[in-house]
Each structure stands twice: as C-alpha cells, then as structure tokens.
Design a protein with these regions (language model features):
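RNA-binding accessory domains that recognize and position tRNA/RNA substrates
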Residues: 1-172, 176-177, 191
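Cysteine-nucleophile active-site neighborhood
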Residues: 176-231
C-alpha cells in the first residue's frame, strides 16, 4: 500500500497520517490507486515531499492531490523521532495550521479536540444506501464501516458478488437479501461506539460464515463479549 492508498483509506478518517518513509510523492498520484472517492485523512506529515514526478503514467503531484481535497500537509518533520514518541505514548492529539498562529493557541486547540475514541467516524464514511457489485452465483454482504475499494475488488476477482450495506443495517434486511456470507469491514475510530452494528451482527451469528477485517474483527469479538486491549 502506497501513500495514495493510505490517504484515501476510510480507516484513517479523523486522523493526521504520518509516513516514516523519508520521501513521499516521487511517483505521483493516480485515481486508479484511490481506495475511496477522496482523501480521508485530516492531514499528512512527511520528512520530505517530492516535487518532481518520476513516473510517466501520472501527472498529479502529492501537493496537487492534497490541495485538490483541501487537506493540509507538512514536511521537514523528523518523522523517525516523532514515530518513537508516538510508539511510546500512543496516538496523540495534534493540529496543523495553514496560517500564522501562536504555538500555545494551536496546542490549546488540539487539546480541546475530542479524543478519537469519543468520535463517531463510521457514519461519515459508510455508504448511505445499499450498493451491489458483480453478478455471480455467490454473494457476500459487507457491513460498510469504511471499506476499501480493493477489498471489494478481491471478491469480484474471485467471482463473488458484493452487497454493500450501511453499517447500521438491520439484521433482518441482510437475511432477507439472501447472501452466502457476511464481512464486517475495516473502519475508523472506536468499535465500541458501534452498538447497533454489534447487536445486528450478534443476531446473524450461525446463519452463515462471518468474518471481519481490522475494526470488523473487533465488532465480531464484541458479540462474544470480548474486550480490546493493546499489547
């Protein structure tokens, strides 16, 4: 996964993304790499942003890409050092300014912002209505907590259709649709806030194969009374 895929990944909604690789943007940006229809992150932090493309197949720079979606980026940051701090302390509140502002005021704004565990981010990235992909003998339902395009493509490449449901779809609606399995997708934020999704998945247990990726695994674990804990 490259920077284009990461920046358009709905799982990073509500977060400032930082790259540990020292140079980003050298091969440009192409829409074929998008994992959603827009940049999902709130900001991008890099050591150096390449200004000259080294890819004949792209014409859009990383800077152009971020500006297109009005997402701030910052370079000349010691990302290796910052990574060590985040590794020790965990995710930290942060803010990026696009104009002159007092340092203390910017820090205060960041501190006033809600923690990511208290934000409802999944509704911002989930499909608002049912969408279908492919016409095959078997179909998998995906509860869309922030699915990436590549996940859908993997099913289609294996001759499996996809019925993409909003994250809060009632379990009976999924049963009535008649699918062969259920996947709970990745997504941003705190899975414990998805009480409705957890309740619906619990009612679908033992009806057909169920699996999840990232946040989806946490949702399924919650239906069995599991708790999440960082090791």
């Amino acid at each position: 996964s490259g920077y284009t895929e990461a920046l358009t990944d709905p799982s990073f909604k509500g977060q400032i993304l930082m790259s540990t690789y020292p140079l980003e943007g050298n091969y440009g940006v192409s829409e074929e790499w998008y994992q959603s229809d827009k940049v999902q992150v709130e900001g991008f932090v890099v050591r150096e942003a390449c200004k000259k493309l080294s890819n004949f197949g792209t014409k859009k720079t990383l800077d152009d890409f971020l500006k297109e979606f009005k997402v701030p980026g910052i370079e000349d940051i010691d990302t290796r050092d910052l990574t060590l701090k985040i590794r020790e302390k965990g995710s930290l509140k942060a803010a990026l300014a696009t104009e002159e502002i007092d340092d203390d005021e910017l820090v205060a704004r960041a501190q006033e912002h809600k923690s990511i565990i208290d934000l409802d981010l999944v509704p911002l990235v989930s499909t608002p209505e049912l969408k279908t992909f492919g016409d095959f003998d078997k179909t998998v339902a995906i509860l869309d907590c922030g699915v990436k395009k590549n996940i859908i493509n993997c099913f289609l490449e294996n001759d499996i259709g996809v019925a993409l449901f909003p994250y809060d779809t009632d379990y009976q609606t999924i049963l009535d649709y008649g699918v062969n399995g259920l996947m709970v997708s990745p997504g941003p934020g705190n899975p414990e806030r998805l009480t409705e999704t957890i309740a619906n998945v619990e009612k679908l247990l033992n009806r057909f194969p169920i699996f999840g990726i990232c946040m989806g695994q946490h949702v399924i674990a919650k239906t069995f009374g599991g708790i999440k804990k960082k090791s």
